[in-house]
Amino acid sequence: MSKYYDGVEFPFCDEFSKYEKLAKIGQGTFGEVFKAKHRQTGKKVALKKVLMENEKEGFPITALREIKILQLLKHENVVNLIEICRTKGEATQFNRYKGSIYLVFDFCEHDLAGLLSNANVKFTLAEIKRVMQMLLNGLYYIHRNKILHRDMKAANVLITRDGVLKLADFGLARAFSLAKNSQGNRYTNRVVTLWYRPPELLLGERDYGPPIDLWGAGCIMAEMWTRSPIMQGNTEQHQLTLISQLCGSITPEVWPGVDKKYELYQKMELPKGQKRKVKDRLKAYVKDPYALDLIDKLLVLDPAQRIDSDDALNHDFFWSDPMPSDLKNMLSTHNTSMFEYLAPPRRRGHMPQQPANQNRNPATTSQSEFDRVF
């Protein structure tokens, strides 16, 4: 499919001037995100600028896909697209849209990465249960509507001041379907920020589905206790090595057919003889046995055996004491917004037994965005 789509027009877009920018809260290769307010009503919104690097070639197909998906998805745990606005400008051969295009969203006060970067923000077990319940509920909804998020990470999980979680940044999302022939689907595998990328994508899988998002959910769930990403690889090979060291060696015994399905499996030098250590490595942080068990089921190497969102929501973790509890009271003690973009880099190397000689890059937005390939 072409990277740009010429047939898009926005004749009924409101003028951007109805909003006043207040602060920049996000930055990446996708563009910029601003906190803003409606000049008349005072309503707070988030403005995401559509990156138009080569506007003369047409409207970016990736932005169009994001807009179409956001217009389809309406759920309490998915960010709400209010409207599309544009600035005034003169049409030229380089800018047929006469200015900039902005996506306007309901404003959320925090993202999960920003909250976890603040040592003063402390989640109780009951509050972690509520976070994961809302996250999995959002995934259940989008997967039921045949949408893959494809960029699950803590920075893309927004939380309002009232404690409502919203899955956000659908810039990499796409519709999926069951393969109609023996050749399967041919989706790009260069999706998902590296530290949250599941083993099947790292091995070159192109016919994938909802399990890729559930792997990210498992990484995020563990992060609720470790406070930083649990597998911080520098390269795809390094990421697979870290996965093997935590989840056990990738073999046909635990993942039937892996040796025949993926050409990369034979080419990569993956650790041999590694035992699965998810529970052992995390038990220093995660004291609840049900939580450990759910993380273990989310971080299963074989996507066919990985727990889905429906079964995850029915896991004993959510139905044992303490029951999930509202986040509003805890968040009410914090008066400032917390976003990854505005926070100092999070502490690193929390997980024990990480290789000591690896040179790791900070978990900055630019690092995570490096892997965004459409």
UniProtKB/Swiss-Prot annotation:
Catalytic activity, as annotated: L-seryl-[protein] + ATP = O-phospho-L-seryl-[protein] + ADP + H(+); L-threonyl-[protein] + ATP = O-phospho-L-threonyl-[protein] + ADP + H(+); [DNA-directed RNA polymerase] + ATP = phospho-[DNA-directed RNA polymerase] + ADP + H(+)
Active site annotation, chain numbering: D151
Consequences of knocking out this gene: Morpholino knockdown of the protein causes in larvae causes high levels of lethality.
The organism's place on the tree of life at top rank: Eukaryota
Name of the top EC class for this enzyme: transferase
E.C. number(s) listed in UniProt: 2.7.11.22, 2.7.11.23
Xref: CDD domains: STKc_CDK9
GO cellular component: cytoplasm; nucleus; PML body
Positions of the Protein kinase domain: 19-318
Comp. bias regions, Polar residues: 354-368
Pfam families, per database record: Pkinase (PF00069)
Region (Disordered): 345-374
GO biological process: cardiac muscle tissue regeneration; cell population proliferation; DNA repair; inflammatory response to wounding; positive regulation of protein localization to chromatin; positive regulation of transcription by RNA polymerase II; positive regulation of transcription elongation by RNA polymerase II; protein-containing complex assembly
Subcellular locations according to the entry: Nucleus; Cytoplasm; Nucleus, PML body
Binding locations of ATP: I25, G26, Q27, G28, T29, F30, G31, E32, V33, K48
Keywords on record: ATP-binding, Cytoplasm, DNA damage, DNA repair, Kinase, Nucleotide-binding, Nucleus, Serine/threonine-protein kinase, Transcription, Transcription regulation, Transferase
Function statement: Protein kinase involved in the regulation of transcription. Member of the cyclin-dependent kinase pair (CDK9/cyclin-T) complex, also called positive transcription elongation factor b (P-TEFb), which facilitates the transition from abortive to productive elongation by phosphorylating the CTD (C-terminal domain) of the large subunit of RNA polymerase II (RNAP II) polr2a, supt5h and rdbp. This complex is inactive when in the 7SK snRNP complex form. Regulates cytokine inducible transcription networks by facilitating promoter recognition of target transcription factors.
Subunit details: Component of the super elongation complex (SEC). Associates with ccnt1/cyclin-T1, ccnt2/cyclin-T2 or ccnk/cyclin-K to form active P-TEFb.
Family of this protein: Belongs to the protein kinase superfamily. CMGC Ser/Thr protein kinase family. CDC2/CDKX subfamily.
Protein's name according to its UniProt entry: Cyclin-dependent kinase 9
Lineage: Eukaryota, Metazoa, Chordata, Craniata, Vertebrata
Encoding gene (name): cdk9
